[in-house]
């Protein structure tokens, strides 16, 4: 099996786990536009992005087909994940007045990121979009531990996902047949389970 085939399979595994977790979370009713409601959006969209990534790596990239459209679709969905995570952070940790400001920022950020994805063919755009939001979410969870609104489980999940991102960004390819993308997916599965 090729490295791209293995990467596609690890993407499918990640998507399966994330969809399972999103389904479990969807079982209990949530107030519309609450932190839990937005976080369910994080999981659902992350599963969609992983599934699109599986199709991209397993079929488009391995066949040498043009990848612009599918890659843009994947990266725009990841922008939606970032939007939902920013709104999760706002709803969980900030007052309603500040939440409105976060909504405006999140909409503008999503629009700018979508334009950047369409114009700049680089995964760096995705990283620069989600990294500040992940850091904010991490910081607010750490600060919130004292008052009980932060979560050690979320902190652990974010740190594991950050390690996965570092592995991918570094291009660490020492676990053949897993390349850096495959290792990223496998480590991300563990991180998502903690979330």
Task: Mark where each language-model region is.
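Extended substrate/RNA-proximal surfaces in nucleic-acid metabolism proteins
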Residues: 78
